[in-house]
């Protein structure tokens, strides 16, 4: 975790240079470099730290795609769940980051997409999840949340708190 945090904070010094580039690819690379999204899953604590740093205008708009796996009455090991989620992660774009909220509950952060693009992308990811699940889970559902003008970490905390109450 400390190594991840050091990477995020060390990349913060490069933000001025990368934000100055007007090219769309450079902006997506900025998101990927900022959070090193292609390498691993993030846990809930690191996601919160990352979201606290997501107030940057270069990252907006931000949408959250929360994915819930209904595991029925069967026990799935973390390895089985992560094997499935790695398939999903391999399909993510440079401006998308995936993390685990808790077992069977994941989030994909969709940076720099307008509302319609985010809906289309979430539907595409959802269809891919259904295809790759091979009927292992009774249901896979998702919620798409637009952060809007609120603080990204506040929206994340409110949603996850609400899910714990259900």
What is the meaning of each model-derived region?
Residues 63, 100-111, 128, 134-163:
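A short glycine-enriched loop-to-beta-strand structural element that forms part of the catalytic core
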Residues 51, 84-89, 119-134:
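Alpha-helical scaffold within the catalytic cores of cyclic-nucleotide enzymes
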Residues 1-55, 92:
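Signal-transducing coiled-coil linker helices
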Residues 46-76:
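Active-site-proximal structural segments of metal-dependent nucleotidyl cyclase/transferase enzymes
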Residues 55-57, 85-115, 135:
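Conserved helix-loop-beta segment at the catalytic/binding core of cyclic-nucleotide signaling proteins
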Residues 28-36, 66-80, 92:
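Active-site loop/short helix in cyclic nucleotide turnover domains
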């Amino acid at each position: 975790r400390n190594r991840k945090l050091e990477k995020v904070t060390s990349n913060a010094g490069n933000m001025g240079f990368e934000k100055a580039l007007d090219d769309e690819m450079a902006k997506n690379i900025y998101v990927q470099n900022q959070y090193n999204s292609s390498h691993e899953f993030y846990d809930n604590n690191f996601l919160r730290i990352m979201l606290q740093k997501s107030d940057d205008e270069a990252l907006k708009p931000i949408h959250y795609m929360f994915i819930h796996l209904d595991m029925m009455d069967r026990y799935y090991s973390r390895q089985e769940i992560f094997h499935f989620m790695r398939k999903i992660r391999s399909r993510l774009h440079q401006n998308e980051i995936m993390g685990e909220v808790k077992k069977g509950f994941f989030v994909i952060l969709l940076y720099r997409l307008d509302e319609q693009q985010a809906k289309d992308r979430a539907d595409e990811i959802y269809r891919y999840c259904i295809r790759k699940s091979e009927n292992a889970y009774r249901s896979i559902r998702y919620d798409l949340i637009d952060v809007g003008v609120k603080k990204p970490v506040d929206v994340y905390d409110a949603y996850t708190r609400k899910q714990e109450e259900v």
